[in-house]
Every structure is written in structure tokens, then in C-alpha cells.
Regions:
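N-terminal secretory signal peptides that target proteins for export/translocation
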Residues: 1-20
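Acidic, serine/threonine-rich low-complexity disordered tracts
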Residues: 44-136, 179-297
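A charged, solvent-exposed segment within the mature domains of Sec-exported extracytoplasmic proteins
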Residues: 137-203
Length: 297
């Protein structure tokens, strides 16, 4: 099994503010792929996944719109597929980043078992891709383009780090729960092709919301605190005084009983130079019984 550690780019003090904006913006797209929605069921045996979920989210930094994130998932029998697309333009267009994500696998009740994952991104003339293959125990293969040597200070990835983990798209299905408090009581092990990390969710509170049009769904958000815990593939120095507050990421979920799922309405990533926020513009759901549910904010 091939294991490749993450590449870390050193930056000068002059570059730091620009990198801070970019990292905060990119963190939104990453966070989005990790908690798009989760099944809300009484038991794993009762899990009934929707036929399709599609959503568009607006990405903002310090109150300025910097891009969007589109997500679609489809289910057929015990198989799933998910795709995502994001575009970010920051610093008055000086920085542009586009990314596409895809993943597929199987379902066992409300537990996803990933089979493959791919991410492609482009920033100016730099093109990157990540491809991950899975077997029954975890990561079976990793291919990176460009395939550059890892930074000598990066924490090496060990075989045990890659067992029973989710790729970012499979992690969208991994936050399953039996009750509202349990939706924010999870530790999600993730490997994105370069870094291995845990996402530790805990309940922060609840928040009332108002719909533009009546939906028949509960008008309340469940707010989860998300702590990003680096495991391997990272440079420890990057987490000594990071731009992003990795301990206080927030994901606000909304229960949709008619479809048996949770959907996130907001993701907030604090940073030292301002918050990056993702909020839902539209969410369209086709439930297992083909009921159509449209949410607008």
C-alpha cells in the first residue's frame, strides 16, 4: 500500500495575510464536504436514504462573497455516489481556485463504506489531483499529482492511520444519529489523500430560523462545535499559531424529518483575520418515497 505524506508550502511574512484568506476560504469547501447531511433514523435497520440531495452554498469571507459550493448525492439500493464543485475568487480576483470532488461506495444501514475518491483543483497554472482507493479495511492506494516528496518535518503516515477512515465525500454520510443531541456527538476519522485527521463534534446549542416560504420542517438549527485534530501528514509547527481556529469550527444542522436526514445550513471557520462562512442558498431533496422538498434561505 502506497502512503504519501502531505506537502506543506513555506511562506514569508509578506505572504501570510494572503495565505490566511486563502486557507480560510478553502477550509469552507473542505468543511462542507465533511458534513453535508446525515440520516436521521430510529435505527440503522430503518435507514431510508433519500434518492437524491442537491445543494448550493454561498462562501463568504469577512462578509464578502468569495465563491460557491455545489453538492449532489445519489442513492440506489445499497450504493451511493456524491459529487461536489467549488469556485473561490478572493482578494479582488487576485486569487482564484476551482475544485471538483467525487466519491462512491456502498451502504450498510446508515454506515458508508467508501470505494473510491477523487479531487481535482486548479489555482492559476497549478493543477493538483488526489485519487484514493479503498478496500474492506481502509485505504488501499493513493495517487497524487504532482507527486512531490513530503516535507521532512511532516508527521509520517503509518498504515494504522489509514484503517477504517472516510474520504471527505464518504464523511458526508458518516455523521448519522438517532436523536438531535447525537447529531453533534461524533468523532469522524478522515483521510484526504495527504493528511489524516479527526473531526470531533460536540453539541453547542440550538438556534431558531425563519424560512422564506413554509416548508413544513422544524424551523430550528442544531449547532455543532467541530474540533479539527491533526493525526499525521501535517507539520506540527503549522498548528502552533495557526491562522484558522481549528478548535472552534461550527456546523449548524437542520433536521428534515420528511426526508429522514439532517442538512447543514451554515458552516463557520474562524480565523485571525476574519471568519469564513458558508450558508445554504438552496437545498433540494427527493425523499425515498419521491416526495420533493425544497428549502430556500
Amino acid at each position: 500500500m502506497g502512503v504519501v505524506r502531505g506537502r506543506v508550502i513555506a511562506m514569508s511574512k509578506a505572504e501570510a495575510p494572503r495565505r490566511g484568506v486563502v486557507r480560510s476560504s478553502l477550509a469552507l469547501a473542505i468543511a462542507t464536504t465533511l458534513a453535508i447531511w446525515s440520516p436521521h433514523t430510529t435505527s440503522a435497520a430503518d435507514a431510508a436514504w433519500p434518492n437524491q440531495v442537491s445543494a448550493r452554498y454561498r462562501l463568504q469571507f469577512n462578509g464578502f462573497e468569495v465563491g460557491f459550493y455545489d453538492f449532489t448525492s445519489r442513492f440506489s439500493g445499497n450504493a451511493y455516489s456524491a459529487t461536489g464543485k467549488t469556485r473561490i475568487s478572493a482578494l479582488f480576483g487576485a486569487f482564484k481556485w476551482t475544485g471538483s470532488f467525487s466519491g462512491s461506495g456502498s451502504l450498510d444501514g446508515n454506515a458508508p463504506h467508501p470505494a473510491d475518491y477523487q479531487m481535482n483543483s486548479k489555482a492559476k497554472s497549478e493543477i493538483n489531483s488526489v485519487t484514493i482507493g479503498f478496500d474492506a479495511t481502509g485505504v488501499a492506494s493513493v495517487a497524487l499529482v504532482p507527486n512531490k516528496p513530503p516535507h521532512p518535518d511532516a508527521i509520517p503516515l503509518k498504515p494504522d492511520n489509514l484503517k477504517h477512515v472516510f474520504d471527505p465525500m464518504a464523511a458526508t454520510l458518516a455523521i448519522s444519529s438517532t436523536s438531535a443531541p447525537e447529531a453533534c456527538n461524533r468523532t469522524i476519522p478522515v483521510f484526504d489523500g495527504k493528511a489524516r485527521f479527526d473531526l470531533k463534534l460536540s453539541l453547542k446549542g440550538r438556534e431558531a430560523i425563519k424560512d422564506k416560504q413554509p416548508t413544513g420542517q422544524p424551523a430550528e438549527l442544531i449547532v455543532c462545535r467541530v474540533k479539527y485534530v491533526p493525526i499525521a501528514g501535517h507539520k506540527p509547527v503549522d498548528f502552533v499559531h495557526p491562522w484558522i481556529d481549528y478548535d472552534h469550527i461550527e456546523i449548524a444542522l437542520r433536521a428534515i424529518p420528511s426526508a429522514g436526514i439532517y442538512v447543514p445550513y451554515r458552516v463557520k471557520v474562524p480565523s485571525t483575520i476574519g471568519p469564513a462562512v458558508m450558508d445554504a442558498q438552496s437545498i433540494n431533496i427527493t425523499a425515498a418515497n419521491n416526495t420533493q422538498i425544497a428549502l430556500r434561505q
